[in-house]
Amino acid sequence: MNGTEGPNFYVPMSNKTGVVRSPFDYPQYYLAEPWQYSALAAYMFLLILLGLPINFMTLFVTIQHKKLRTPLNYILLNLVFANHFMVLCGFTVTMYTSMHGYFIFGPTGCYIEGFFATLGGEVALWSLVVLAVERYIVVCKPMANFRFGENHAIMGVAFTWIMALSCAAPPLFGWSRYIPEGMQCSCGVDYYTLKPEVNNESFVIYMFIVHFTIPLIVIFFCYGRLLCTVKEAAAQQQESLTTQKAEKEVTRMVVIMVVFFLICWVPYAYVAFYIFTHQGSNFGPVFMTVPAFFAKSSAIYNPVIYIVLNKQFRNCLITTLCCGKNPFGDEDGSSAATSKTEASSVSSSQVSPA
């Protein structure tokens, strides 16, 4: 084995020289230089500095402006709330531990941080699944003129949290475990060992199939069918130009969110899968640390995409920041500026573009 396994940790370094110590008790500066840990702490501080105000303002503006509280926006806000949750409960811990060079909060703190990080990431993934299914049903119309209403949105939100908990909670109850990963400053599911005492192998397989592969298959299927339908409708002029534009704009926003999610999380999933399928292979701590910390940036881009691509939300945000007045004269979002996201909550003939 090219790593050192303890009762509640796995350090990716052989202990032949006797320098390996528990990542809960000692700085891990034999894994990387102190400046590298400082760089991780600075990176997490930057994510917190950006993530807290962006996610908070997105939630606050939506609560303040009633017209933004549409059914589809419930799912988008659920995603933003999950990101805010990750920043508050996960990023702050990781920044502090990186400053010290080891996971200073002990095994219990590792379980808590790992749980919150996994929960937030899974809520984001399943929210994108719900958005993909909603786009497929509304645009492709496999269920005729289905209306995505408030009850459907609430059920969708509940579904995302149930699925996320079914992934994040088992390690808390003895199926697998959370351990420090990479440079030992943040915690995640144990991909490093088989650990038969906690049936770790079966959990990792379950996680990759149910909570990564299946969601991606659903997302790709929905958007594959959606793109075909949009092209057919445009060619046959089955929908009005305003309807087509509104549906395309909503779809574009969600597709961009999916693409960025994949950019952030696929490298982490690939590295984790490689480590799991190559037990005991030789890899450095940075090999897992870089994709793990890069994946954390996903908490920033979703609200940014939402703000940039949703004209009505931008108008409401400007109105809020300017104390109720929009200096650009589009204060309340005129009737011509109906939200793109409302396209999914009304019938096609009622949709107007943003």
Curated annotation (Swiss-Prot):
List of glycosylated residues: 2, 15
Covalent lipid sites (S-palmitoyl cysteine): 322-323
All ranges on the Cytoplasmic side of the membrane: 62-73, 134-152, 225-252, 309-354
A cellular component term, taken from the record's GO annotations: membrane
Pfam families (alphabetical): 7tm_1, Rhodopsin_N
Keywords, comma-separated and alphabetical: Cell projection, Chromophore, Disulfide bond, G-protein coupled receptor, Glycoprotein, Lipoprotein, Membrane, Palmitate, Phosphoprotein, Photoreceptor protein, Receptor, Retinal protein, Sensory transduction, Transducer, Transmembrane, Transmembrane helix, Vision
Chief site of localization: membrane
One BP term from GO: absorption of visible light
Membrane topology: Multi-pass membrane protein
Record field: compositional bias (Low complexity): 334-354
Disulphides: 110-187
Intervals of motif 'Ionic lock' involved in activated form stabilization: 134-136
UniProt site (Plays an important role in the conformation switch to the active conformation): 113
Transmembrane segments: 37-61, 74-96, 111-133, 153-173, 203-224, 253-274, 287-308
Segments on the Extracellular face: 1-36, 97-110, 174-202, 275-286
UniProt-annotated stretches for the region Disordered: 331-354
Residue numbers carrying N6-(retinylidene)lysine: 296
Record note on modification: Contains one covalently linked retinal chromophore. Upon light absorption, the covalently bound 11-cis-retinal is converted to all-trans-retinal. After hydrolysis of the Schiff base and release of the covalently bound all-trans-retinal, active rhodopsin is regenerated by binding of a fresh molecule of 11-cis-retinal.
InterPro entries xrefs: GPCR_opsins, GPCR_Rhodpsn, GPCR_Rhodpsn_7TM, Opsin, Retinal_BS, Rhodopsin, Rhodopsin_N
Cellular localisation: Membrane; Cell projection, Cilium, Photoreceptor outer segment
Family: Belongs to the G-protein coupled receptor 1 family. Opsin subfamily.
Record protein name field: Rhodopsin
Higher taxonomy: Eukaryota, Metazoa, Chordata, Craniata, Vertebrata
